[in-house]
Swiss-Prot record:
Protein EC: 2.7.4.-
Residues making up the signal peptide according to the UniProt record: none
Pfam families linked: PPK2
Keyword list, A-Z: ATP synthesis, Kinase, Transferase
Role, per record: Uses inorganic polyphosphate (polyP) as a donor to convert ADP to ATP.
InterPro entries per UniProt: P-loop_NTPase, Polyphosphate_phosphotransfera, PPK2, PPK2-rel_1, PPK2-related
Similarity-based family: Belongs to the polyphosphate kinase 2 (PPK2) family. Class I subfamily.
One GO-annotated biological process of the protein: ATP biosynthetic process
Top-tier EC class: transferase
GO MF terms held by the record: polyphosphate kinase activity
Reactions catalysed: [phosphate](n) + ATP = [phosphate](n+1) + ADP
Annotated protein name in UniProt: ADP-polyphosphate phosphotransferase
Length: 289
């Protein structure tokens, strides 16, 4: 499968205009059967890489997913990471913060769940909510006990971007590789998926009035995402704006990016020392008796 993932990568310092980024590209598969074959190959590839990551125990991988409602975050996570050993991969979904979490800084609740070395951590939404939904609805800040006198203008958001960049630089320096995915869905495709959630009884549970309410702020969200991607994509911790109107295509792109990221790490299985090899041979002889 040849996917040039660089075309979806946001360059460090690049000013993002999402209107110029595609929400759909030509499919990388020829049929549904071909898609399943490609994805199965990718899942097996990721499973092998995760095993090597765990055995080498030098790096951790953090995958962050952000998107508008109905963009397919859950589906991407489920399909792409389905073949990975559950002991080596943890998924965390961050929704409304608890009362305890609100008493801490905005990065606290997510940093508690960062992956340790040898593991893959997946954040379904993340600390980026604090510069996305909170920027669209700044009244949320009133519940965050932000210090009195703080002005919620441009400088406030730039401080948050800087805090995020500093955190990610620190994590990278200590062995965690971070890859961030924005599933770029068109407004029209979201409408179609919302209608499907209403029209198909088995999908009714996925839809709420809040989803429709947030859709009214579409332009505000796009503006917040543009600023976020522009300010926080870096060479070490890049954002990928993944076209998400085609769910199958999005899954293939994400799987390819993850595989390329993991293959770029200097990983190897631990070498067996002569003493250990001698010990293993002795145990083998005992088993053969």
């Amino acid at each position: 499968m040849k996917i040039k993932t660089k075309q979806f990568r946001v360059g460090e310092g690049e000013k993002v205009d999402l209107g110029k980024w595609p929400t759909k590209v030509d499919p990388f598969y020829e049929s549904k059967e071909h898609y399943h074959e490609l994805l199965r190959t990718q899942v097996e590839r990721l499973s092998d890489l995760q095993q090597l990551l765990y055995a080498s125990n030098r790096h951790a991988v953090l995958l962050i997913f952000q998107a508008m409602d109905a963009a397919g975050k859950d589906g991407v996570i489920r399909h792409v990471l389905s073949g990975i050993n559950p002991q080596g991969c943890q998924v965390f979904s961050f929704k409304h913060p608890s009362a305890t979490e609100l008493q801490h800084d905005f990065l606290w609740r997510t940093t508690r769940d960062l992956p340790e070395r040898g593991r893959i951590g997946v954040f379904n939404r993340s600390y980026y909510e604090e510069v996305l939904i909170v920027r669209v609805h700044p009244d949320i800040l009133q519940s965050e006990a932000v210090p009195n006198g703080e002005n919620f203008g441009k400088s406030f958001w730039h401080k948050r971007y800087r805090s995020i960049r500093n955190l990610e630089q620190h994590l990278h320096a200590n062995g965690t590789r971070i890859v961030k995915f924005f599933l770029h869905l068109s407004k029209d495709e979201q409408r179609k998926r919302f209608l499907a959630r209403i029209d198909e009884p088995e999908k009714n549970w996925k839809f709420s009035a809040a989803d429709l309410e947030e859709r009214q702020y579409w332009d505000d969200y796009m503006d917040a995402y543009e600023k976020c991607l522009s300010e926080t994509s870096s060479e070490d911790s890049p954002w990928y704006a993944v076209p998400a109107d085609d769910k199958e295509n999005a899954r293939l792109i994400v799987s390819q990016v993850i595989a390329e990221t993991m293959e770029s790490l200097k990983m190897s299985y631990p070498e067996t020392t002569p003493a250990r090899r001698k010990e293993l041979l002795q145990m083998r002889q005992q088993l053969l008796k």
